[in-house]
Amino acid sequence: MAYGDTPYDEQLKRAWEEFCDKLKSAQSLIFNDTLGATALDRATGFQYLSRYISKALSEKFENDPLYPQLWQLQTPTNKSFGDNPDCTYLVTWLDGAHTYKIAGNRGTVSWVSFLVNGAEFNITHSAINNSQLKTEWDGSFQIMLSAQQHPGNWLKLGPGPNFLFIRQFFGEWDTEEPMWIRVERVGDFEPPPPLTPERLIRGLENAGNWFLSDSKRWVDWVEFYSDQPNQWVSKMPGWAGDGQTGSLGRQLQFCYWKIQSDEALIFEVKPPRCAYWNFELANRWFNSTDYRYRFSSLNGKQAVYEDDGSVRIAVSHVDPGIPNWLDVGGHCVGMVNQRWVEAQEHPVPTAKLIKVADLPRLLPPNARRITPEQRREQLRRRKIGVDRRFPV
């Protein structure tokens, strides 16, 4: 067959070219940036865009609310919008006119949440969190999703498109068991119809538009915090809603960090009693930094505590010699995201920028320290945990 052999060829060609033109135009987002103007930031900027291509196609084309299939939103090699290294994200689109059922087993993962958002990021229709999920003695559970209420676990669907967002927060990466889970539309149905040119054309248009708008959204997010470097801010951009849209029960704080090669940003805080807490690094493009081979995040089960129950965390280019280290991986600017989950208090960590060389004399005599052998063991367990959570 050759071009022109079907009546749809011209439309398909135009749709593909327009999609590719949108991808090409996004380069201005990287080259016009002033925050991350190093070679590393440029390279990771285009990596950011390349990852968004697959996300755009998954979000706006490779899904059908009538035949829902859960897919992994974030992985170690496909990241976006401040992904949490502790978290496995499962998502799919649903139609508010239908009824769906989730079935699965809770596993032993530290914390889970089920969220139904509208078509817009800042609209939440319903949520079930860790403490609200009703399970059987063996950990099995079922959740109904519909516009009309059901007994037991139920998530309300809004009219039109609904985005199901499932989070699993792992504390001990190398031991906790993930949920087993599936979703289906209730009823008897024929298999989905074959792909049509019309659906492909519509999907490419929607994916291209979403790629342009959403990739810019997270570049703007980091810029929102950049005028207050090395300090914590709980406010979020106006389009993000009340700051808790992502998962009810969370309290989020953000810090735009700016650190030279001989500096360290020291956080100190006494964590409150809570279901889960963490600190995580993201680069200028709001992608988590390498968490398989570097210490780019820390949670309550991984942390080493001081005698008084506090934690001391160093964000730096070089190993500071204390247990809780966040390795910037060559970046000089980026974000730290911090979460308290199901906590009665939400303390703000102290933040102090120092010279790495000054750290030993600034530490109290009884401060926790770490040997090179202990650091290697930390990293070994970390890689095992990532490989276990994201098997081939």
Residue map of PLM features:
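A compositional/structural signature for long, glycine/proline-rich flexible linkers
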Residues: 1-392
